[in-house]
From Swiss-Prot:
GO terms for biological process: fatty acid biosynthetic process; lipid oxidation; oxylipin biosynthetic process. Keywords: Cytoplasm, Dioxygenase, Fatty acid biosynthesis, Fatty acid metabolism, Iron, Lipid biosynthesis, Lipid metabolism, Metal-binding, Oxidoreductase, Oxylipin biosynthesis. SUPFAM superfamilies: Lipase/lipooxygenase domain (PLAT/LH2 domain), Lipoxigenase. Plant lipoxygenase may be involved in a number of diverse aspects of plant physiology including growth and development, pest resistance, and senescence or responses to wounding. It catalyzes the hydroperoxidation of lipids containing a cis,cis-1,4-pentadiene structure. SMART domains: LH2 (SM00308). Residues 42-171 form the PLAT domain. Residues 174-866 form the Lipoxygenase domain. Its EC number is 1.13.11.58. The lineage of its organism: Eukaryota, Viridiplantae, Streptophyta, Embryophyta, Tracheophyta. Binds 1 Fe cation per subunit. Iron is tightly bound. This is Linoleate 9S-lipoxygenase.
Length: 866
């Protein structure tokens, strides 16, 4: 009926949903009048920043916001879709039941004759002086022959004068480039050109340009020489994934380095708008780094009588009694609402951290050998362990530079604890494993040990017992030879002991291993292998895949907030003398060492089955549920991860095969080919010559590539991130530094260890000051925001595409994830699977897909959002 009535001079009714700047204003938050800047802003003052620029919804009325529809089916003389007459926002609508929190809805009417065809895009211009707003969506009702047309926008709209080209949005239809309606083709191409920019100039807050740069902004050499840091990326010696380009001016003293600033440019929509103030975790993290941490450090420094932990009970008092604070310090941070979020003050002049899960049931179970080994397959860094395939363990380091680094662990060390099995027999039956932290650390060990920290390159050998648990057999600690690196390491092997000073020595040996694991986890497993490697994908996607491209729509949820948190990390976490350098063993060499590890990064091996096979902890087996058979059968991360991996891949396969009916369609997709070419040659350009890159010529490769990317951004990041505080919040269990070497027999240090092992242990690992810093930061990192988007969810709800087949496939994906969660819960209730809860009685929940907000030790967000 609508098509019969719709003729010349008729009007199309639309509804525009937007959010006022004062609801989401990050700048206002950072400037909030509060003792602690962003923290005060991020919690609780949002409502009081009553629109310094936009006071009421009436500011949008009149001729403030102009829209014009663009036809998808009827072209003008130049071949471009016809553009309607201008229309402006009209009345404020208050009766829309689906309206989100803090959202405003406005009506709009477009003049749209039947000879204009069907709308497929629209222009929007903001003429308000100085005020940007967040455009959520436009919905057109009763469009002839179509019905409703929805445009999911989710974008900041600045004053028209800030843009060189008009802001355009497309309807939520999905098109391969070759299937784009002819009248929309040039609009699609022009928008991508806008997002690519021209590679020049310093980027401004309102810009939307995506471009690449090397990591040359970690140091501050103009401030002082010791803050200079090498450029990561652009060389074969220190290769690195690319970051987003900001165009800031270069430093004076190091022209290859970029100057730093408090705010780092992001393409505007990457600084996503959150509705609830408590969701500004990124900004909370920044404020915790810049405000709370210095206050805590000053308190500990001033406590001259108690600058160190002396007993394990002292550490536990962080959760029980708390840190007593002087009145002046308390007055500075207690008004901050974050105070009650991160700490439990209970009305006392003290800060209390929440008790980490690892000690909630048993205070001392973390010290057992079984728990030490279990955390290598069910802890926060569960994907480093690999099978020992030959003996003795060999090094891949250049022997001309570093001498013979073959392990000094012998059969005689191992066989007394193998229960009658020989080393050869254990290898043949796939029962020897190692988390090898020797090669990554050894080349930097001499430099690290020249500082206040003292460390070893470590090797650990584990035995898979008949009951399915792992048992540590030996730990090798190595230091550089005093006569030079080419002489090889000086190594000593330590064996398990349960009594006397030997038990204390063994506990320290395990601590040196965990310190190395903590550093490798934070800089490689977490930062490099999730945060850093994904950023080039985000940049390449936005530069070459239109928002209406099916692969853009598939990947978009897995990019949310990642460039944002990465920019913050470069500013306060991984920068020179930032949180990581200050509190982790690798110190000033942390990022440089991660660059050396990146040389061996292989994209296809980031997919879980390939990763397990490469590490020798699984073998291909077509008869097994996911095509691989685990050699450590009770391996919580791997067994749970394979369920999630299979669900992701099944979803991606259905999706890709719907849009690409043949392999030829992959090769013929110009946008996809440009995206992949630039990703390989520029985004990960330092590895562009590697032969392992997919050629992107068939559906199988595209399915695998998308599955791997989604896996990294969701499940892999969840596995290595959200357990940081539950496991590492108890510093005794996951120390981040070592300050002393192992005591030698006959020395005063050895005697001290024999008399008081707790004090000796605490004087060896992370000091009190750094512990408080570390705990404050990893508690924020381990939290979920209340508006977190989890795997199987989309922020647009059902409006992300009009195609019913992908919609139904996505719903099945969500349903499958719920079924998997039930299965994982059942596994955790199976007492025969000892590695799932261990001596600490802490079930492995990190790969449960869903979660509530807060510190939950579970939940798989879609993206690397914290």
């Amino acid at each position: 009926m609508a098509s019969l009535l719709f003729g010349r001079g008729q009007k199309l009714k639309g509804t525009v949903i937007l959010m006022q700047k004062n609801v989401l204003d990050i700048n206002a938050l950072t400037a909030a009048q509060s003792p602690s800047g962003i923290i005060g802003g991020a919690f609780g003052v949002v409502g009081s920043i009553a629109g310094s620029i936009i006071d009421t919804a009436t500011a949008f009325l009149g001729r403030s916001v102009r829209l014009r529809l663009i036809s998808a089916t009827v072209a003008d003389a130049s071949g471009k879709g016809k553009v309607s007459k201008e229309a402006f926002l009209e009345g404020l609508l208050t009766s829309i039941p689906t309206l989100g929190d803090k959202q405003s809805a406005f009506s709009v009417h477009f003049e749209w004759d039947s000879n204009m065809g069907t709308p497929g895009a629209f222009y929007i211009e903001n003429f308000m002086q100085g005020g940007e707003f967040f455009l959520v969506s436009l919905t057109l009702d009763d469009v002839p022959n179509v019905g409703s047309i929805k445009f999911a926008c989710n974008s900041w709209i600045y004053n028209d004068k800030k843009y060189q080209s008009d802001r355009i949005f497309f309807a939520n239809k999905t098109y391969l480039p070759s299937a784009t309606p002819a009248p929309l083709v040039s609009y699609r191409q022009e928008e991508l050109k806008t997002l690519r920019g021209d590679g020049t100039g310093e980027r401004q807050e309102w810009d939307r340009i995506y471009d690449y740069d090397v990591y040359n902004d970690l140091g501050a050499p103009d401030q002082k020489a010791t803050l200079g840091r090498p450029v990561l990326g652009g060389s074969s010696t220190l290769p690195y994934p690319r970051r987003g380009r900001t165009g800031r001016k270069k430093t004076v003293k190091e022209p290859q380095s970029e100057s730093r600033s408090d705010t780092v440019y992001l393409p505007r929509d990457e600084a996503f708008g959150h509705v609830k103030s408590s969701d500004f975790l990124v900004y909370i993290l920044k404020s915790a780094s810049q405000n709370i941490v210095p206050q805590l450090r000053s308190v500990v420094t001033l406590q001259l009588n108690n600058p160190e932990f002396n007993t394990f009970e002292d550490v536990r008092s962080l959760y029980d009694g708390g840190i007593k604070l002087p009145t002046d310090v308390l007055s500075k941070i207690s008004p901050i609402p974050l105070f009650s979020e991160l700490f439990r003050s209970d009305g006392e002049a003290a800060l209390k951290f929440p008790p980490p899960k690892v000690i909630q049931v048993d205070h001392s179970a973390w010290m057992t050998d079984e728990e030490f080994a279990r955390e290598m397959i069910a802890g926060v860094n569960p994907h480093i362990i690999k099978e020992v395939l030959s003996f003795p363990i060999k090094s891949k380091l250049d022997s001309q530079l570093y001498g013979d680094n073959t392990s000094k662990i012998t059969k005689e060390h191992l066989e007394p604890n193998l229960g009658g099995v020989t080393v050869e027999g254990a290898i043949q039956t796939n029962r020897l494993f190692t988390p090898d932290h020797h090669d990554a650390l050894f080349p930097y060990l001499r430099k690290i040990n020249a500082t206040a920290t003292k460390a070893y390159a470590t090797r650990t050998v584990l035995f898979l017992q008949d009951n399915g648990t792992l048992k540590p057999l030996a730990i090798e600690l190595s230091t550089p030879h005093p006569d030079g690196d080419s002489f090889g390491p000086v190594s000593k092997v330590y064996l398990p002991a349960s009594e006397g000073v030997e038990a204390s020595i063994w506990l320290l040996a395990k601590a040196f291993v965990v310190v190395n694991d903590s550093c490798y986890h934070q800089l490689v497993s977490h930062w490099l292998n999730t945060h850093a490697v994904v950023e080039p994908f985000i940049i390449a996607t936005n530069r070459h895949l239109s928002v209406v491209h099916p692969i853009h729509k598939l990947l978009l949820p897995h990019y949310r907030d990642t460039m944002n948190i990465n920019a913050l990390a470069r500013n306060v976490l991984v920068n020179a003398e930032g949180i990581i350098e200050s509190t982790f063993l690798w110190g000033n060499y942390a990022m440089e060492m991660s660059a050396v590890v990146y040389k061996d990064w292989v994209f296809p091996d980031q997919g879980l089955p390939n990763d397990l096979i490469k590490r020798g902890v699984a073998v291909k087996d077509p008869s097994s549920p996911h095509g691989v058979r685990l050699l450590i059968e009770d391996y919580p991360y791997a067994s749970d991860g394979l369920e999630i991996w299979a669900a992701i891949k099944s979803w991606v396969e259905e999706y890709v095969n719907f849009y690409y009916k043949s392999d030829a369609a992959i090769a013929q997709d110009a946008e996809l080919q440009a995206f992949w070419k630039e990703l390989v040659e520029v985004g990960h350009g330092d590895l562009k010559s590697a032969t392992w890159w997919f050629k992107m010529q068939n559906r199988k490769e595209l399915i695998e590539a998308c599955s791997i990317l989604i896996w990294i951004a969701s499940a892999l990041h969840a596995a290595v991130n959200f357990g940081q505080y539950p496991y590492g919040g108890y510093i005794l269990n996951r120390p981040t530094k070592s300050r002393k070497f192992m005591p030698e027999k006959g020395t005063p240090e050895y005697d001290d260890l024999a008399k008081n092992y707790e004090k000796a242990y605490l004087r060896t690992i992370t000091p009190k000051n750094d512990t408080l810093t570390d705990l404050t930061i990893i508690e924020v990192l381990s939290r979920h925001a209340s508006d977190e988007q989890y795997l199987g969810e989309r922020i647009e709800g059902d409006d992300w595409t009009t195609d019913s087949v992908p919609k139904e496939a996505f719903k099945r994906f969500g349903k499958k994830l719920a079924e998997i969660e039930e299965k994982l819960t059942q596994r955790n209730n199976d007492e025969s699977l000892r590695n799932r809860y261990g001596p600490v009685k802490m079930p492995y929940t990190l790969l449960y897909p869903s979660s509530e907000e807060g510190l939950t030790c579970r939940g798989i967000p879609n993206s690397i959002s914290i």
